[in-house]
Regions:
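Conserved, structured core segments of small domains
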Residues: 2-225
Length: 225
């Protein structure tokens, strides 16, 4: 029996974790980048995105979540970005991702326009934990139920905005809502994956949302599965 085309082309989510290289080129290409990102959202190819900020308040990269039918299609979106075309990036990691937990209200409240000019800012601060796991799959499986329960508790308390594993199960993205970086980092450090040594490494950065398409942020599986 032939598999339906609609099934074959079911969209997938891809994280693009970007680090800036040449800041002068970033500045020169920023307007074109904003326009490109707006177009992707309008076409249903960009779920959410915005700059990553370090502890000193410097914008050092980007975190985008694309929706595409294949990795090749998602890679095309990366390569056509004006920042990429301007050779302004130091690095990027494009990884297929599964969305397990989401708080759309938080994400919408955190959203701010990329060209906002009225000086206002969102009262919601988000912090992204971009994690890599150790290879021990048996340990990962043993700790996962406690990790899920912990994430559900954070989501219920309004402290978790996004959560889910990489498709290859070698890492995950966890986005926390907190007034301060220290508070958000404490949520990551209290995760059973952190306590039990599942996390091999992580990067932890504030994430400023500059555009969101809530219709694309549907769960790939339930928080309890």
């Amino acid at each position: 029996m032939t598999t339906p085309v609609a099934y074959l082309e079911r969209p997938m989510k891809f994280i693009n974790f970007v680090k800036y290289g040449d800041l002068d080129r970033i500045a020169a290409a920023r307007k074109a980048h904003f326009a490109y990102a707006d177009g992707l959202r309008a076409r249903g190819e960009l779920a959410i995105g915005g700059p990553l900020v370090d502890e000193q308040g410097r914008r050092i990269g980007l975190l985008f979540i694309y929706e595409a039918v294949s990795r090749e299609a998602a890679l095309g979106l990366v390569q056509e970005d004006p920042f990429t075309l301007a050779n302004a990036l130091r690095s990027y990691e494009l990884i297929e991702w599964r969305l397990r937990g989401v708080n759309l209200d938080l994400l919408v409240k955190a959203n701010r326009s990329g060209d906002q000019s009225d000086g206002s800012s969102s009262p919601v601060r988000l912090f992204a934990g971009y994690t890599k796991y150790r290879v021990d799959q048996s340990r990962l499986a043993a700790v996962r139920p406690a990790h899920w329960k912990y994430d559900q508790a954070l989501e219920g308390a309004g402290k978790m905005a996004l959560a889910g594993p990489f498709a290859d199960d070698e890492g995950g993205l966890f986005v926390y809502n907190a007034a301060r970086r220290e508070e958000a980092l404490s949520y990551l450090k209290q995760d059973p994956f952190a306590v039990e040594g599942v996390f091999a490494s992580y990067e932890f950065l504030e994430w400023i949302i500059e555009g969101v398409n809530p219709a694309l942020l549907t769960r790939d599986f339930s928080s309890s599965s």
